[in-house]
A protein has these predicted regions:
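Short amphipathic alpha-helical elements of helix-turn-helix/winged-helix folds
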Residues: 32-36, 74, 103, 155
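Amphipathic C-terminal alpha-helical segment
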Residues: 106, 110, 146-169, 178-182
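Amphipathic alpha-helical segments used for helix-helix packing
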Residues: 101-127
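Amphipathic alpha-helical packing segments from all-alpha helical-bundle domains
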Residues: 119-154
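Residue-level detection of the helix-turn-helix DNA-binding "recognition helix"
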Residues: 52, 66-67, 77
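Basic, helix-initiating cap at the start of DNA-binding domains
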Residues: 1-40, 44-53, 70
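Hydrophobic alpha-helical connector segments
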Residues: 70, 74, 81-108
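Short hydrophobic/aromatic patch on the recognition helix
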Residues: 54-65
Length: 182
């Protein structure tokens, strides 16, 4: 009985500070990666530059990610999760689509990829059988319903390649959400 009482006095999560540090480090690495894509370009960016810009040691970077591709995958996961979060916080489906559209159209990393590395961008956008795309598709289906989500995702992919302005984002989001039956 005494042993179980001592367990109750232990902190709920003794690893919370380590987890928080891990998350901050990951955020710094992913933010640095996105900045480097925007300034240096995807192909020219190196793991050494990612470590330097994120202000972590190379060993720390490699403890988190084994290579540039794994950093890029984590960045894609993070960005799609961010877009889903934007959609979930929006007051309605039209606003959600509009906000996601503006984020995609104004993203500096996507802008740089369109100019410097369109082939990699096209490959990434066409890999819609990937688990990341499936998760994004499911989240969009919860927001819009399955038929509208298919249209909305294709519309958003188009903006990664051919961005639109904020006014177009609003009017086109209204058109998509206004469709009764496809």
């Amino acid at each position: 009985m005494r042993a179980s009482l001592s367990l109750l006095s232990m902190p709920l999560n003794k690893y919370a500070p380590q987890v928080a540090t891990h998350r901050r480090t990951q955020r710094a690495i992913l933010q640095a990666t996105k900045e480097l894509i925007a300034t240096t370009g995807l192909k020219k960016m190196s793991m050494i530059e990612i470590a330097d810009v994120s202000e972590v040691s190379r060993a720390t970077l490699y403890n988190h990610y084994r290579d540039k591709e794994s950093v890029l995958l984590a960045l894609c996961e993070s960005e799609l999760a961010r877009l889903v979060e934007i959609a979930q916080k929006a007051p309605d489906a039209t606003t959600a689509l509009e906000q996601i559209s503006v984020e995609i159209s104004q993203d500096k990393a996507l802008m740089a990829m369109r100019a410097q590395d369109p082939d990699s961008l096209t490959v990434a956008l066409s890999a819609q059988t990937d688990t990341l795309w499936k998760a994004f598709s499911i989240a969009m289906a919860h927001l819009l319903g399955s038929e509208k989500s298919e249209l909305a995702i294709r519309w958003l992919i188009g903006q990664a390649l051919h961005p639109i302005n904020a006014q177009q984002s609003r009017s086109q989001a209204e058109a998509i959400t206004g469709i009764a039956n496809l």
